[in-house]
């Protein structure tokens, strides 16, 4: 039976890095489509599970080390923790207003988790958890369901007024209302696909270009290109975490702020 690599003719397939594998698997098959990558159940510990756990441990380490010995003259770890705290706190307050600050802990947790998932994926032999819809969709759905529930809890049926554009002419308001409802329910789709798509695309490009490094004539150029793209991917990792978080704040503003357009 031909393996996936043999079928495509590539020595290293750029998408192999995104295959979910069980950590504890007994098989002698060298095929990428073996028992380790099939028949995965919800209780199996996979590479996704492991790297999400590592991300949580990294977040805990940053916050614990940064707040363990607080001083007027902050240490490096305290400076990092205070920088992250101040950055996210200001973002939440500026976007959602004073009423949204009470939800700052959730927003900061979300930002740190996405950021660590993105950055850890750049380490050699690691796994980018945020490149999988199985990770980004639940994150986006938690935001969507939470914001919707909060909106009805705070505003009651008045939360639905956000779909009725009062600034538009009366004749086209029903049409705009339908568009607003559709765009509202599309939020978790765009919220999750944006993050997963950007993280997957960048890593795939790096793998494709790195595949030419075995050609001696172009290897110096390839190494330089991979280094440049790698630096760009580090920036993308931070930017995508920021975009995911600020969109969460924008959606949160609909629930805690005025629901009228």
UniProtKB/Swiss-Prot annotation:
This is ATP synthase subunit a. CDD domains: ATP-synt_Fo_a_6. GO terms for molecular function: proton-transporting ATP synthase activity, rotational mechanism. It comes from Cereibacter sphaeroides (strain ATCC 17025 / ATH 2.4.3). It is a multi-pass membrane protein. InterPro entries: ATP_synth_F0_asu, ATP_synth_F0_asu_AS, ATP_synth_F0_asu_bact/mt, F0_ATP_A_sf. Key component of the proton channel; it plays a direct role in the translocation of protons across the membrane. The chain crosses the membrane at residues 45-65, 107-127, 133-153, 162-182, 209-229, 232-252. The keyword Cell inner membrane applies. The gene is atpB.
């Amino acid at each position: 039976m031909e393996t996936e690599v043999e079928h495509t003719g590539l020595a290293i397939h750029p998408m192999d890095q995104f295959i979910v594998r069980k950590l504890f698997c007994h098989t002698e098959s060298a095929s990428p489509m073996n028992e380790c990558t099939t028949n995965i159940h919800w209780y199996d510990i996979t590479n996704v599970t492991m790297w999400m756990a590592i991300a949580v441990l990294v977040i805990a380490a940053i916050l614990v080390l940064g707040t363990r010995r607080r001083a007027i003259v902050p240490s490096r770890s305290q400076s990092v923790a205070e920088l992250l705290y101040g950055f996210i706190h200001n973002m939440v307050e500026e976007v959602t207003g004073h009423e949204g600050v009470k939800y700052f802990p959730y927003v900061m947790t979300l930002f740190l988790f996405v950021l660590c998932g993105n950055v850890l994926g750049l380490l050699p032999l690691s796994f980018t958890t945020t490149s999988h819809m199985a990770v980004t969709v639940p994150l986006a759905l938690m935001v969507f369901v939470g914001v919707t529930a909060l909106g009805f809890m705070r505003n009651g049926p008045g939360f639905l007024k956000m779909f009725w554009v009062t600034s538009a002419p009366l004749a086209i308001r029903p049409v705009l209302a339908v568009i607003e409802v559709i765009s509202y329910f599309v939020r978790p789709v765009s919220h999750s696909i944006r993050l997963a798509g950007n993280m997957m695309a960048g890593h795939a490009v790096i793998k494709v270009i790195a595949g030419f490094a075995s050609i001696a004539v172009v290897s110096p150029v390839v190494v330089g290109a991979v280094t440049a793209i790698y630096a760009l991917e580090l920036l993308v990792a931070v930017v995508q975490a920021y975009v995911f978080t600020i969109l969460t704040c924008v959606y949160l503003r609909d629930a805690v702020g005025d629901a009228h357009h």
